[in-house]
């Protein structure tokens, strides 16, 4: 079983299998995601990284041909049961996608929208929450004088930080990021990476990335996946400097993938 013992576990994956129809996409995955740490999933395209990430908040639930078997324990509760409230799960486990996806509304309302689904706040309290989320996402100083402008008025990097602010505004416990920098320039990427490192003070962060250097810079633990299997899961420094499996070494040295 692949576990990291340096911190308490926030998510425990046990014998997880995932299917797209008859296609067996994830095969007997076992791993523990450490609380208030950054865990990165790396591997070539088609390895199952994003599929695994999306099981953590049941993004597949709208598609009846997709199914997960096994257990995913969030603080000890199996989220794969049919009794799991999807809305409450996604309030606990937020997600930021590959491309920035601001809502077609103001910067302020992008942040407030999700909060309104779960909380009834007075305007002053909502103003405070919006400022708090934008500050956490390192975006407040750039937006405080234009909160009522469209979210689309921001640059690509700012839009992605807006999406992160939107995700944390409802105060989740886990934040999932699926290739959050793939559409961004190097300067914006650097700011997002700094933000990811800061966010782990308050959240458990899981990131999917094709960029091995990004995983090495940002994460505490890294999982290498290949063809739906978890090949190796370790402390990030150990995985990149002294991998235990030849497949891992071949991938990080560019021999395949």
Curated annotation (Swiss-Prot):
It comes from Salmonella choleraesuis (strain SC-B67). ATP binds at residues 43-50. Pfam families: ABC_tran. It catalyses: phosphate(out) + ATP + H2O = ADP + 2 phosphate(in) + H(+). Coiled coil: none annotated. NCBIfam families: 3a0107s01c2. One of its GO terms (biological process) is phosphate ion transmembrane transport. It is found in: Cell inner membrane. This is Phosphate import ATP-binding protein PstB. Part of the ABC transporter complex PstSACB involved in phosphate import. Responsible for energy coupling to the transport system. It is a peripheral membrane protein. Its EC number is 7.3.2.1. SMART domains: AAA. GO terms for molecular function: ATP binding; ATP hydrolysis activity; ATPase-coupled phosphate ion transmembrane transporter activity. Residues 11-252 form the ABC transporter domain. Belongs to the ABC transporter superfamily. Phosphate importer (TC 3.A.1.7) family.
């Amino acid at each position: 079983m692949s576990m990291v013992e340096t911190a308490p576990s926030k998510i425990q994956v046990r014998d997880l299998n995932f299917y797209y129809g008859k296609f067996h996409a994830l095969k007997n995955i076992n791993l523990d995601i450490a609380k208030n740490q950054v865990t990165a999933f790396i591997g070539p395209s088609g390895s199952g990284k994003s599929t695994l990430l999306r099981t953590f908040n049941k993004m597949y639930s709208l598609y009846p041909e997709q199914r997960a078997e096994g257990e995913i324990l969030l603080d000890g509760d199996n989220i794969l049961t049919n009794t799991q409230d999807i809305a409450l799960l996604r309030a606990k486990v937020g997600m930021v996608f590959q491309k920035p996806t601001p809502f077609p509304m103001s910067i302020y309302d992008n942040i407030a929208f999700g909060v309104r689904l779960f909380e009834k706040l007075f305007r002053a309290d909502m103003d405070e929450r919006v400022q708090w989320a934008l500050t956490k996402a390192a975006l407040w100083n750039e937006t405080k004088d234009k909160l009522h402008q469209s979210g689309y008025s921001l640059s690509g990097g700012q839009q992605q930080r807006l999406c992160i602010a939107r995700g944390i505004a409802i105060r989740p416990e886990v934040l999932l990021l699926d290739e959050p920098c793939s559409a961004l320039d190097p300067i914006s990427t650097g700011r997002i990476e700094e933000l990811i490192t800061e966010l782990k003070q308050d959240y458990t962060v899981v990131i999917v990335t094709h960029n091995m250097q990004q995983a090495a810079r940002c994460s505490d633990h890294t999982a290498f996946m290949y063809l739906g299997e978890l090949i190796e899961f370790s402390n990030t420094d150990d995985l990149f400097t002294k991998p235990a499996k030849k497949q891992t070494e071949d991938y990080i040295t560019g021999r395949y993938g």
